[in-house]
C-alpha cells in the first residue's frame, strides 16, 4: 500500500461514523469559494493584486507554522478561484522572522515600503507580535495578529491598528479555571517560559483561580528560558515546594522535556496538571506514547468535531494536502477568512475603512461563527477544553467541550481600565 493510501485508510478509520456521514453529505466543496462569491460561475480576478504581508516564525516553530501556511495558502487558492476580492486577485508575501522581534520589524518595513502590501498579518511569539503591533501603530498600517496570545496585545498595549484572531491567555486561562477550581488542590506551582506569553498566562491564571478559589495559594514559580528548559532541575524545584497541582504553560520541545522527566520521576499523573495548549496535535504528535493522562488542557481534537464548518474545512484541507489539519491550520485558514470578510465588508483595502469594517465584524472560521469585538479588537474564536488520554499509542483529548471565546472575555468596563483610550477611538 502506498503512503497516501495508507494515510487515508488511517484517517478514515479514526473518523466516527457520524463524522464520515457528515462529510459525505456536505461534499468536498471549498469553504471560502462558496461563501465569498455565492452561487454561479466566478469571474477570473484581474487588476492589481490585493497584497497581504505575512510575517511568522516559520523556521523556529515549524510544527505549528508549516500547517498554518498550508491552510492560508489553501484559503487564498479558494478565494482566487471564486473571483478574488473586489474583483482582484489576492497575493500573500510571506517572511520568516526567525522568532526575533528585530527581524519582524525589518520585514514589516520592507513589506510596506518595497512590496506595497495593503496590510500586515501573522506572527506567533507574543514578543514578536507586540513588536509588529507597535510598528503598525507608528506607521498606521493595519495588522491582523493571527497567533500571539499575550493579553497586552489588545489591552495594555493595544492600538487601533491591531486586531487579534486567536483566544488570548486570559481567555484560555478562564476556560481552564472552571475545571481547575474543582480540584481539591490548594497549593499550586506554575511552570512557564520566561517571556511575554508565559508571563501573561501565569498572571491571568493566578488572578482568575484566586477569584474562583480564594483558599488557593501559589507556592512557587518556575521560569525556564524559552526552548531551554532543564527538566530535571525544574521538576526538582517544583517538588521541593510540595505542590498539590501544577499550572503548565510550556510548549514544543520544552513540553516534551518536561513530560519525559515527569513520567520518569512518577510526577505525572500523581500531581494534577492544568496546561495551556497541550491538547493541540502539534504537541501530542511529538509526545506520542509519553502523553500524560488526565491533564486538563486546551487543544484541538480534530477527529472529534462534528460541525458543518469544521467538516467542510477538514475535507478541503485533507483533499488538498493528504494530511489532517493541526491547530495552526485552523488559525491560518481563519486568518484568511477574517481578512476576506473585512475587505468584502469595507469594499476597500484602505486602512481606515478596514478598521471600521473589522470592528464588530462577524465572520466564519473552522470553529464556527466568530466576531471581532469593537472595544478591544479581540476575536471571539474559542478553543476546545478536555483531558488528555493515551489511546492506540498516541495522545488525544477526551471529555471535550467547545468553549466559545465570547463567554470568556472581560466586560467593556474592565477593558476600558486596561486599554489605552486612543486605541478605542
Predicted regions and their residues:
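N-terminal secretory signal peptides
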Residues: 1-17, 24-31
Amino acid at each position: 500500500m502506498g503512503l497516501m493510501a495508507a494515510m487515508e485508510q488511517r484517517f478514515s478509520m479514526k473518523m466516527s461514523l457520524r463524522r464520515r456521514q457528515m462529510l459525505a453529505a456536505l461534499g468536498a466543496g471549498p469553504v471560502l469559494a462558496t461563501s465569498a462569491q455565492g452561487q454561479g460561475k466566478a469571474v477570473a480576478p484581474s487588476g492589481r493584486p490585493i497584497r497581504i504581508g505575512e510575517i511568522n516564525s516559520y523556521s523556529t516553530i515549524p510544527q505549528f507554522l508549516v500547517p498554518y501556511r498550508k491552510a492560508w495558502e489553501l484559503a487564498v487558492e479558494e478565494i482566487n478561484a471564486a473571483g478574488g476580492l473586489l474583483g482582484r486577485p489576492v497575493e500573500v508575501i510571506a517572511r520568516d522572522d526567525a522568532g526575533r522581534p528585530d527581524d519582524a520589524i525589518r520585514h514589516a518595513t520592507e513589506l510596506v515600503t518595497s512590496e506595497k502590501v495593503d496590510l500586515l498579518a501573522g506572527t506567533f511569539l507574543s514578543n514578536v507580535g507586540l513588536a509588529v503591533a507597535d510598528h503598525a501603530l507608528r506607521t498606521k498600517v493595519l495588522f491582523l495578529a493571527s497567533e500571539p496570545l499575550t493579553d497586552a496585545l489588545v489591552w495594555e498595549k493595544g492600538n487601533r491598528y491591531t486586531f487579534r484572531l486567536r483566544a488570548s491567555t486570559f481567555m484560555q486561562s478562564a476556560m481552564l479555571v472552571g475545571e481547575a477550581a474543582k480540584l481539591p488542590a490548594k497549593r499550586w506551582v506554575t511552570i512557564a517560559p520566561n517571556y511575554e506569553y508565559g508571563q501573561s498566562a501565569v498572571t491571568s491564571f493566578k488572578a482568575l483561580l484566586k477569584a474562583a478559589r480564594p483558599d488557593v495559594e501559589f507556592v512557587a514559580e518556575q521560569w525556564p528560558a524559552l526552548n531551554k528548559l532543564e527538566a530535571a532541575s525544574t521538576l526538582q524545584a517544583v517538588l521541593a515546594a510540595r505542590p498539590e497541582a501544577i499550572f503548565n504553560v510550556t510548549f514544543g520541545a520544552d513540553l516534551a522535556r518536561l513530560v519525559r522527566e515527569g513520567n520518569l520521576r512518577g510526577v505525572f499523573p500523581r500531581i494534577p496538571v492544568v496546561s495551556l495548549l497541550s491538547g493541540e496535535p502539534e504537541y501530542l504528535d511529538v509526545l506520542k506514547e509519553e502523553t500524560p493522562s488526565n491533564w486538563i488542557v486546551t487543544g484541538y481534537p480534530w477527529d472529534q468535531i462534528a460541525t458543518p464548518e469544521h467538516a467542510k474545512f477538514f475535507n478541503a484541507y485533507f483533499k488538498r494536502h493528504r494530511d489532517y489539519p493541526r491547530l495552526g491550520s485552523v488559525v491560518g485558514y481563519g486568518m484568511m477568512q477574517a481578512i476576506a470578510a473585512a475587505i468584502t465588508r469595507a469594499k476597500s483595502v484602505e486602512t481606515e475603512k478596514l478598521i471600521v469594517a473589522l470592528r464588530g465584524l462577524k465572520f466564519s472560521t473552522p470553529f464556527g461563527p466568530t466576531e471581532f469585538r469593537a472595544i478591544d479588537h479581540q476575536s471571539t474564536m474559542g478553543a476546545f477544553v478536555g483531558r488528555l488520554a493515551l489511546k492506540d499509542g498516541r495522545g488525544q483529548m477526551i471529555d471535550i467541550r467547545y468553549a466559545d471565546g465570547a463567554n470568556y472575555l472581560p466586560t467593556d468596563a474592565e477593558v476600558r481600565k486596561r486599554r489605552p483610550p486612543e486605541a478605542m477611538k
